[in-house]
Amino acid sequence: MSSIARPPDPCLVAIILIVRSRAGPRLVFHYPPNPLSENGLRPARKERRTSRSKNGQDYKSNESSSSEESGSSSDDDEDEHQRQLQSQSQSQSHLSGSVVSGRRSSNFGLDDHVAMSVSPGGDSQRAGSMGSGSGRTSFRKRGGNSDVEEDSGAASDRQEDGSGGAGGPYRPPWESLLGLPADVWEKLLSPSPAWHKRRFEVGINDLAFIGWPVFVREDGTWRKQRRKKKKKRRADWEGGELGHNENAEDAPDDEDGDAGGNASGGGGLMAASTETLSPKQVTLSEAKRGSGSSGKAARSLVDCLDGDDKDSMTMFNVVFVLDPPLLEYSMRTKEVYDNIIKKFAKALKWEQARTDYVWREAQHISHLKEKAKERRTSLNTLYTELITQSSLARAIYTVHTSISASKIASVPLSPDVSISLQIPPLTSTPYLPGPTDKAYPGLWLTTADSVTPVEDPTADEYTAPHQVLAKHFALLLLDNEAAILRDVEASGGALAPALAHYLRCSKPTKSFAQISASSGIPLSTIQMLASHLVYWRRARAIPPIHQRDTYIVSPNCDLSKLEVATAAYQAAFPTLPSLPKMLSALSGTPRPYGSFIPSKDHKETYFAILAWLLRGGWVTQLRSFARVKVTPEIKMAVEVALRREEVDKYLRKGRSLEAQKSTDGENGNEEDENDDASSSSSSSLASQGSGEETPMPGRYQQESNPRLSHSMLDRNTSLRTSSLILFPHRASPLESRWLEQIVSRFPEHPRSAGRHRRGEGSNAGGGEIDPEYAALSTPMKDLWPTYIKYFNGLDALEKIPVREGLKRKFVWQVLTRLGLVTSQQSSIELDPREQVLVSVRHW
């Protein structure tokens, strides 16, 4: 698998709503009505999950797996169903529904293994529970040349004219899904209470069925009633649980906090940052009234719809059917589960607890389907009625259509609650696609939003970006500021005033910290508001635009849109150089962007042009990266010092032992023998101390002609070649000694220190240092600790002025002294002892 980051690919095939009452599980609604023909499915792939065997013996529902939050649990009824499926080997059937050209011919592999046969009596009975014996679907073997019409389950998908299949009673086409009768899915996708608020996942061939089942509490309620405490009143539902920074894992004992409002403190602010631009609040009193009257509302509606069916719902499960690629299975299923499945189910749980929403809508949908069955309504007509008359069916339809297109799904569940769901889009990539990778032209090409060792010392190259934006970033709006302000002000909501104020203060040339200092808005609030705008695709976080930075035409820009972009650019900047001319100028030798600005009067206008180019992915910032180079000379000096230390340590230990032996001998009875031994030993030590008679390994060698080839501390380190220190912030013991040796060689007085003083004694070294050249006159030993942490090859050197609060000219003078190579000619007198960096430039 390529390391290139990929944009969201929901792989969404269908959404299924399963409810369970005392009468048993029921497949209430699914969308689209015929996933095999109505979904734009990817072509058949040979690299489908090979771990799932293609013979009938291995055809079974994969073990329902839970994530870390779920632990291990299983459903005995599902196991029984799996054994039933396993008992039929090499069975075949044909799925109903036409598959258009270019779609997977295998129909997810279901037709290669399973043949469904309903009882001759007509419609199969719904089982009272998953483990009940009645209503079980029978499986049988079929020949390879068996007629498609023999399978009434398959034929039902094509019956939109009201005629019965194979002479049997009428079976509506909406009572089968993916070629299988509804009662099969009702049993399979209705788990036991052990799966309450856990990731429920079933794999069938190429498909993954993932849900977040919610069960009623033992006391008959859907939320745990909190104890009354005198606390600050909080908002009950602002869509906060729908945020991108929400914890993906639920606390096991969290019964009602999962959808019941924002957390306190900073976490609450960040959660609130992801509400929709038009949130509708539900007050606490309304929630209590709705929750208290939910039973009455449910009973009244049930009486109206079906006087004989007065049972209540005990479980609902919104199941998403996914078809992810083999190599991206875990990543794709996780992003859909974390961002869509779990949050949608939480919102439904909230409304179910408040107004009995899910059960009322399920009853309403069932009532409409029964009427359609009596009238033998066509499938398309029924679904038009359902989406028009049922808010839950319309919500499922909206989620499917929007998420399948990688768009934001704005779902109004009721007049009081409106939620927005999305899979956060990929806004940038640090990689250019390879020959076998799918290209995404126009995607912002940069490493600016990657986690670096300075931001997180424990992070590595493949760590995901931080959810909380760093204070040194700036905000680049992806739409016209006036248009965004109009939307915000028209939407109302808790965040609208703060968002409008921040948008008026924000500039792409100012970091969040600078905006906070100038506007008085707390930094945490700015980060929260910026995260809100970034998450909802209204803005992008970028390094602040500066005239001293260098920008180039992005290698990933989408030149196929040049003609359209040229017209839009001309409309925005009619009196300035055209888009092709700007791109041509930026394609030349890289130089600071300020060199393209004709005068100070054009500065703001040219910054607006640069923001426009960045917004469309036409240009990217060319940034500098550096690492510390260790020469063989440094390595040899450190190695000689290390070996000398070992010899000295050995000699000190020998002297200590000999002194102790001499002391013990003087106190003994045989003084003469001890005196001889002492004399002999002293003579030996004297010869060792002189280094003339006793040879020792690694003895003082001539530094001018060393014969060492590998380090004593690290036998894999060659002393005859140069090396780079990859991560100075976590250097090894040997690398630390190299760094100490490098610093010890820095001169005490820079060569140019005396040339940049003011006053009469400037030539003699007296007078004050000119602030303009302070970086050239300060000893490098004093500057080194501030800069070394950025020399890891991952942190851009352009970050240093912003993060350290230093002037850019000062920083670049220091970096030039250290060996940074730039395109500009430098008049700084360099000292070879300070030239320790190896630098590169890229995005």
UniProtKB/Swiss-Prot annotation:
GO terms for biological process: cellular response to amino acid starvation; meiotic cell cycle; negative regulation of TORC1 signaling; positive regulation of autophagy. Coiled coil: none annotated. Residues 62-73, 84-106, 677-693 have a biased composition (Low complexity). The lineage of its organism: Eukaryota, Fungi, Dikarya, Ascomycota, Pezizomycotina. The keyword Signal applies. Residues 1-23 form the signal peptide. Pfam families: HTH_NPRL3, NPR3. It comes from the Eukaryota. This is Nitrogen permease regulator 3. Residues 248-258, 667-676 have a biased composition (Acidic residues). One of its GO terms (cellular component) is GATOR1 complex. Residues 235-247 have a biased composition (Basic and acidic residues). Residues 43-52, 223-234 have a biased composition (Basic residues). Belongs to the NPR3 family. Keywords: Meiosis, Signal. The keyword Signal applies. Residues 30-174, 222-272, 657-706, 749-768 are annotated as: Disordered. Residues 259-269 have a biased composition (Gly residues).
